[in-house]
From Swiss-Prot:
Keywords: Chaperone, Cytoplasm, Nickel insertion
Region called Disordered, residue ranges: 1-30
InterPro entries in alphabetical order: UreD (IPR002669)
Compositional bias ranges of the Polar residues kind: 13-23
Lineage: Bacteria, Bacillati, Actinomycetota, Actinomycetes, Pseudonocardiales
Keyword Chaperone attributed: yes
Functional description taken from the UniProt entry: Required for maturation of urease via the functional incorporation of the urease nickel metallocenter.
Keyword Transport: no
UniProt protein name: Urease accessory protein UreD 2
Cellular localization per UniProt: Cytoplasm
Coiled-coil regions, chain positions: none
Organism the protein comes from: Saccharopolyspora erythraea (strain ATCC 11635 / DSM 40517 / JCM 4748 / NBRC 13426 / NCIMB 8594 / NRRL 2338)
Subunit text: UreD, UreF and UreG form a complex that acts as a GTP-hydrolysis-dependent molecular chaperone, activating the urease apoprotein by helping to assemble the nickel containing metallocenter of UreC. The UreE protein probably delivers the nickel.
Principal location class: cytoplasm
Length: 283
């Protein structure tokens, strides 16, 4: 995540305890899980659990009213090949939480040919709200990342989830990238989506998928209020060469905005036009 460090000598240090773990063996990656738990206390959201680990340094920002805010700051280059990274977030009944990242996440090659994994688990309770608003994920040449989102929502929970994928840095091809999003609401499936790019997905850059575009993203909004007033379907973008997208209701109180564009900037503009969540990481 964030800027690439000159080396990884800092790997194996956990930010929440004084212990220092042994450095990883050659050819193996880092195994780390950061955890966040938000609860409501007298109408204000507090964070009884905020545990950093590995490359994830969790920084608590000033509350926005009753809403707690956390920014994930990169403590080292990650994910690299062989890494097994995870973030586990639980927003309990009545709590409100916004999570952002300080910079884009770079999927990098690393010292091993093994793939990296990045697993995000989001659990949102009754009358609770979660904004998951990270900066883009950039798949760089030679990288191999498998990313998963597993989301479990209570019937009255609200969620805004943003994902932006950038396929390759300027003038270079991407690595291999797969992203799997699974959302359950009240124990029932709401959305299951699996996208794959790179050498393992023939045709990903053909006219039926991305064509000449190298940036794709989506915003998922789940809100019980949509049960009575679902948003209308509408198209995004006036010029296909500069990017295009669609906002469409799902079979549930949810709406999904998806877009693709040549680069990160027009992609962000398209998604911002679809819905406008709060912007990240300002104190």
């Amino acid at each position: 995540m964030g800027r690439r460090a000159p080396d990884r000598l800092d790997r194996g240090v956990t930010t929440t305890s004084p212990r220092t773990q042994a450095p990883p063996q050659a050819g193996r990656g880092v195994h780390a899980t950061a955890r966040i738990r938000a609860t409501s206390h007298d109408g204000v959201t507090v964070l009884p659990l905020l545990r950093s680990d590995g490359p994830f340094h969790l920084r608590q920002l000033r509350n926005h009213g009753s809403q707690a805010r956390v920014c994930v700051v990169s403590a080292m280059s990650a994910p690299l090949g062989g890494d097994r990274l995870a973030i586990d977030v639980s927003v309990e009944a009545g709590a409100q939480l916004e999570i952002t990242t300080a910079a884009a996440t770079l999927a990098l090659r690393g010292a091993t040919t093994d793939h990296a994994t990045y697993d995000v688990t989001l659990t949102v309770g009754e009358q609770a709200t979660l904004y998951w608003l990270p900066q883009p994920l950039i798949s760089t040449r030679g990288s191999n990342l498998r990313q998963t989102y597993t989301v479990d929502l209570a019937p009255t929970a609200r969620l805004i989830l943003r994902e932006e994928l950038i396929l390759g840095r300027a003038h270079e091809p991407p690595g291999d990238l797969s992203s799997h999003l699974t959302v359950h609401r009240d124990g029932r499936p709401l959305l299951a989506q699996h996208t794959t790019f790179g050498s393992t997905a023939p045709g990903w850059d053909g006219p039926a998928v991305l064509g000449e575009h190298r940036a794709t993203g989506q915003i998922l909004i789940v809100d019980p209020a949509f049960a009575n007033a679902p948003p209308a379907t509408r198209l995004l973008g006036d010029e296909p060469a500069n990017g295009e997208g669609i906002v469409a209701p799902l079979a549930g109180p949810a709406v999904l905005a998806t877009a693709l564009a040549p680069t990160a900037t027009p992609l962000r503009h398209l998604l911002d036009d679809a819905v406008r969540p709060r912007t990240p990481c300002s104190t």
